[in-house]
């Protein structure tokens, strides 16, 4: 019987690999043999439940699973919000397909400790000259050398290979799990099992860390402070104006040890902050990079992004208003809970405030999160100012949306500090405020250089049906037509507007930012 199970488990693996290789549009195309082997090891337990099935049953089951997960999120992005800690749920035997456009280095190193980063670089032959290099500096170095390191490890860089954790000790793995509130069997001493637990949770934890860092920096109101002197260094007086709570939160976010006996003394906290002021400079650059990514122009985005941004923005804003007016279904599906664990405290409060839900000012983040879950189907009672005028007419143009977002800019973007620091970024995007005609023209010219496959994917993102007999010129013309109405230079055909309105008004809102 054991031999039979083994044979069928191996057969399940081959069926899986066959399906992977047959799917030419998937991220698996870029995976190396080592990545595939690692994937199968990661999903070993899930595969075992199919070991008693016949080969034909396995093929049937594998086909059904493939159809079900034709476009799933990567398995590391499956986030259950059943508790305040990160989920430990098993992603399923075929729960992973990822994006071939984004290497895991985008998020992999964000929650690593300084020592782990330094050891990783050293083990993989990357010299770090500065013994006092900050964590952000080490993360940057790791990302810059990621392709070279991945190649040496026989990994593609598009799967969180276990080999990236070779430099971690058992203690390192346990510390990471403990520091990030991940439940695991403390009796487990197997490094392989601990690596597996870290891999299951590291993407979700990285997303949460990003949101928490963003929330903290926004709460510090950096935009209205003169932080840098004329030489570009942190001013000596910056921390004097921070409250004790702000200082404590900032120091703890950078893993600075605080003497518990001195934790309430403002002078002590200021002194500790000044000793670690280099971290604030890292925060500023991180924040500006984040803002740049969030507000970057259409021209720096992928074709898929451009094709979806208008629909997604319109869907989101329309559904927000329609939910307030009681026009949509009162049930928010479980997708709402995806990412809830990464919400900062302010966002949780905003969600509750907009629905008139009362909560104690002393509520912990966990208590607020639980209240949000219970209140997820409550209708909005407080409609943010100036929303209505943009929703009474369901045919608003891109200019309307641009105007709305311009009205809602964060104070940070209007500040002199932002203008000063962003001047380098402005050089990159100096033409982004040109007339919409110029944007559309630029895209039209760009289409000429795209491959036929690029054009097909771009049109697919708009939901445009394409005949199999279409030539490249046909695809270019279709791309131009759909891009022109996206940017407002040509009005979308009436039948398209009708279909989009039906689609937009029928979707349920998942939450709001």
Curated annotation (Swiss-Prot):
Specify whether Secreted is a keyword of the entry. Answer: no
What species is this protein from? Saccharomyces cerevisiae (strain ATCC 204508 / S288c)
Instruction: Output this protein's name.
Output: Meiotic sister chromatid recombination protein 1
Keywords per UniProt: Phosphoprotein
InterPro entries, from UniProt? Ish1/Msc1-like (IPR018803)
Q: What else is known?
A: Originally MSC1 was identified in a screen for mutants that show an increase in meiotic unequal sister-chromatid recombination (SCR). Present with 1070 molecules/cell in log phase SD medium.
Spell out the GO cellular component terms annotated for this protein, sorted alphabetically and separated by semicolons. endoplasmic reticulum; mitochondrion; nuclear envelope; plasma membrane
Q: According to the lineage, what is the superkingdom? A: Eukaryota
Biological processes per GO annotation: protein localization to site of double-strand break; reciprocal meiotic recombination
Task: Fetch the Pfam families from UniProt.
Answer: Ish1 (PF10281)
Which positions carry Phosphothreonine? Answer: 237
């Amino acid at each position: 019987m054991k031999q039979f199970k083994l044979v069928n488990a191996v057969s399940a693996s081959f069926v899986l690999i066959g399906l992977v290789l047959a799917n030419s549009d998937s991220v698996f195309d870029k995976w190396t043999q080592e990545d595939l082997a690692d994937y199968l090891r990661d999903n070993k337990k899930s595969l075992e439940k199919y070991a008693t099935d016949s080969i034909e049953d396995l093929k049937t089951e594998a086909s059904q699973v493939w159809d079900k997960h034709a476009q799933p999120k990567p398995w590391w992005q499956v986030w259950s919000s059943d508790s305040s800690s990160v989920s430990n749920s098993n992603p399923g035997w075929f729960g992973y397909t990822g994006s071939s456009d984004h290497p895991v280095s985008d998020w992999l190193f964000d929650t690593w400790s300084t020592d782990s980063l330094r050891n990783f670089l050293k083990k993989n032959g990357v010299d770090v000259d500065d013994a006092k290099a900050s964590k952000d500096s080490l993360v940057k170095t790791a990302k810059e050398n990621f392709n070279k390191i991945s190649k040496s490890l026989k990994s593609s860089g598009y799967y969180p290979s276990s080999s990236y954790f070779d430099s971690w000790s058992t203690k390192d793995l346990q510390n990471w799990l403990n520091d990030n509130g991940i439940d695991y069997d403390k009796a487990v001493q197997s490094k392989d099992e601990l690596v597996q637990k870290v891999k299951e949770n590291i993407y979700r934890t990285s997303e949460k860390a990003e949101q928490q860092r963003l929330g903290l920096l926004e709460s510090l109101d950096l935009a209205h402070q003169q932080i840098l002197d004329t030489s570009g260094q942190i001013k000596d007086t910056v921390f004097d104006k921070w409250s004790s709570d702000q200082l404590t939160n900032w120091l703890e976010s950078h893993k600075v040890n605080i003497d518990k006996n001195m934790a309430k003394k403002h002078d002590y906290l200021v002194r500790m902050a000044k000793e670690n002021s280099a971290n604030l400079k890292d925060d500023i650059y991180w924040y500006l990079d984040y803002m740049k990514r969030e507000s970057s122009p259409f021209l720096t985005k992928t074709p898929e992004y451009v094709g979806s941004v208008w629909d997604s923005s319109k869907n989101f804003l329309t559904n927000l208003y329609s939910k307030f007016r009681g026009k949509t279904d009162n049930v928010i599906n479980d997708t709402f809970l995806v990412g809830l664990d990464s919400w900062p405290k302010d966002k949780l409060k905003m969600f509750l405030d907009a629905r008139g839900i009362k909560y104690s000012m002393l509520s912990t983040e966990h208590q607020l999160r639980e209240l949000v879950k219970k209140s997820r189907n409550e209708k909005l009672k407080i409609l943010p100012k100036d929303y209505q005028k943009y929703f009474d007419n369901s045919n608003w143009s891109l200019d309307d949306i641009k105007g709305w977002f311009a009205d809602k800019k964060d104070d940070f973007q209007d500040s002199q500090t932002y203008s000063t620091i962003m001047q380098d970024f402005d050089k990159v995007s100096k033409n982004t405020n040109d007339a919409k005609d110029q944007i559309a023209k630029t895209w039209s010219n760009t289409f000429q250089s795209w491959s036929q496959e690029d054009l097909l994917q771009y049109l697919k993102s708009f939901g445009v049906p394409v005949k199999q007999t279409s030539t490249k010129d046909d695809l270019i013309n279709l791309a131009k037509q759909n891009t022109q109405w996206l940017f407002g230079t040509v009005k979308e055909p009436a039948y398209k507007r009708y279909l989009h309105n039906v689609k937009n008004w029928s979707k349920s809102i998942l939450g709001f930012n």
